[in-house]
């Protein structure tokens, strides 16, 4: 995946040296702001990923024409009015008015306002950095196979409309590239980021429903643009894997802390006491709460607790006030040292983000089925850590 303008030439040089033809996609930042935390929002312009769809300072509201296509004449219909051929060296704006370049003579009195807005949006995209890099990749087509574009907008996104907006913008880029270079991008990868429920108050994205909505939107946009629909790819890693993982912790200490009268829980209710439940893990095996403010829940796993509950905060063993695993959860009032706490939905970005912070050992991973359990990844040992040290 190409992430910046200088990469195509470097990849082309390597491919030529190896006698290969590399398959590449361009990662495009669509300008869609999505994702619950700044660190996992990846489609706005001021971050490290991808190449911007629009020029700096462009009026992104012009892309809103994609939200109301009723006033846009379907390409390839009887309203195809422009018959002139574009010539090499013409501006992108002028080329968009011709034949495959753009199916309308925009000066014709029968052209709707929607048609004009669509031509304006395409012109703006044609002047953007993303199209320039697509052209650069296409220029090396002898050693680079341009597979398509990639648009990952963020992580743990609850609003499926954000994916639809990003998809529409990629369809417009695809149409514009066809208009300027007569090349049809075969694939659009919309990445991942589909939400999962980490706590009782959250919902997982209904992929069946939302992907059906997205498919309808993509079909409609391409029909109006006169383009064949591309292959649409997705990367639902978190949505697939996160619910399969549960992390088990052993309780070390249980410490009630009296709070001032101004303290409140996350629902806004006043609280006078919070119980700090310290366990034998923490930010070394799950950094997400400290890094992103991610929320989890917990349950006692080794026995049935009392019906009475207390407001608790599950914290880790590291010397950090921010070493919090579950910020707020009601646990049985009789929780005690030695209990096992289960924290669900840790199958994604738990073990893979684990570290040896403070020389902590990374725990084992055990696969469990109805009939069997076996160790998939063994527990790290002190000897494992020492193996990295050079004694000479």
Please report, for each region that a protein language model flagged, where it lies by residue:
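Electropositive phosphate-/nucleotide-binding environments in soluble metabolic enzymes
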Residues: 2-5, 53, 124-128, 164, ...
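Glycine-rich and small/hydrophobic secondary-structure elements
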Residues: 205-222
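Active-site-proximal beta-alpha core segment in soluble small-molecule metabolic enzymes
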Residues: 1-82, 88-187, 196, 217, ...
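Conserved, mostly hydrophobic/aromatic
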Residues: 11, 26, 149, 190, ...
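Charged (often Lys/Glu-rich) extended helix/loop segments that serve as interaction or gating elements
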Residues: 219, 223-392
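Short glycine/threonine-rich loop-to-helix capping motif typified by GTGT followed
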Residues: 157-166, 197-210, 241-253, 326-331
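Anionic group-transfer/hydrolysis microenvironments
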Residues: 5, 29-31, 152, 191, ...
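Flexible glycine/acidic-rich beta-alpha junction loops that bind and position SAM and/or redox cofactors
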Residues: 32-36, 154, 186-202, 232-244
